[in-house]
Regions:
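Short beta-strand elements
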Residues: 206-229
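Surface-exposed loop/edge segments in extracytoplasmic proteins
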Residues: 156-164
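A glycine-anchored, Pro-Gly-centered beta-turn/N-cap motif
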Residues: 129, 144-146, 166-205, 213-215
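Contiguous beta-strand segments within globular domains
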Residues: 120-144
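Long, contiguous interaction/targeting segments characteristic
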Residues: 15-110
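Short, compositionally biased P/S/T/A/G/V-rich stretches that sit at domain boundaries
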Residues: 103-126
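Fungal secretory targeting signals
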Residues: 1-16
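Beta-strand-rich binding/interaction modules
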Residues: 143-153
Length: 229
């Protein structure tokens, strides 16, 4: 439903403008791909079945794709004991989990930035329109692994998504997120984009937005609206 696209001086990829060497990031991408749902499954699996069978058995229950691949790579690299210990103390926060197993470098405590504004195009359109929403932000002191989060609410469905990044050097950035407002009557529950005003909100964070864990920071947020006619 959402897609992240690049704008001038924006994320050319999720790993643009990183503050660390590629060797430090070798495990970071597969680790964060586990996500909160993947971590939740692994915690429940450990509670219900233990870790007999090691990494292979633990990771096999994840759906094939980036989650299982990330689990296999990371658990194999750090070992089952360190993997399970981190799972039990990180509260399903994928970024903090990846920092705890040293797959991602810890965020900088002096990281600083601000959210400068937003824009949307078009401002009004019928259901089926793809709206492009832009967030502008500045980085004052270099940041570590974090996310840009967007949430949309209105008379139709409430939707949201987070986009991970591995940090930014000081500078000014603009990142676009596109939202396709296409009805889907086959979905459960059905998706219908009703006419009215929709509010969107961006947050730019180091670590997971809203996390209380060390190194996590919210640099700011910004809101805007668009209309479905």
């Amino acid at each position: 439903m959402f897609a992240l696209t690049a704008a001038a001086a924006a994320l050319a990829s999720p790993f643009a403008h990183v503050q660390t060497t590629q060797s430090q990031l070798a495990l970071c991408n597969p680790c964060v791909q586990l996500g909160g749902q993947g971590l939740n499954y692994l915690v429940n699996e450990i509670l219900n079945a233990g870790v007999i069978g090691g990494c292979g058995k633990l990771c096999h229950g994840l759906k094939a794709g980036v989650e299982r691949t990330g689990c296999d790579i990371l658990c194999g690299a750090v070992g089952i004991e360190a993997f399970v210990k981190a799972l039990n103390k990180t509260d399903l926060d994928p970024i903090y989990f990846c920092e705890e197993v040293h797959a991602c470098p810890a965020g900088r405590d002096d990281a600083a930035g601000s959210v400068d504004g937003n824009a949307v195009s078009p401002a009004t359109g019928p259901a089926g329109t793809t709206f492009a929403m832009q967030v502008d932000f500045s980085v004052i002191n270099a940041t570590g692994v974090g996310e840009i989060r967007i949430a949309v609410k209105g008379p139709g469905p409430s939707v949201g998504q987070s986009f991970l990044n591995t940090g930014f050097t000081p500078g000014h950035y603009a990142t676009n997120v596109t939202l396709a407002t296409k009805d889907d009557p086959s979905a459960q529950p059905p998706v219908q984009w009703l006419p009215g005003t929709y509010e969107y909100e961006f947050e730019v964070c180091q670590g997971e937005c809203g996390s209380k864990h060390p190194h996590s920071k919210v640099f700011g947020s910004t809101k805007g609206t668009f209309q479905i006619a």
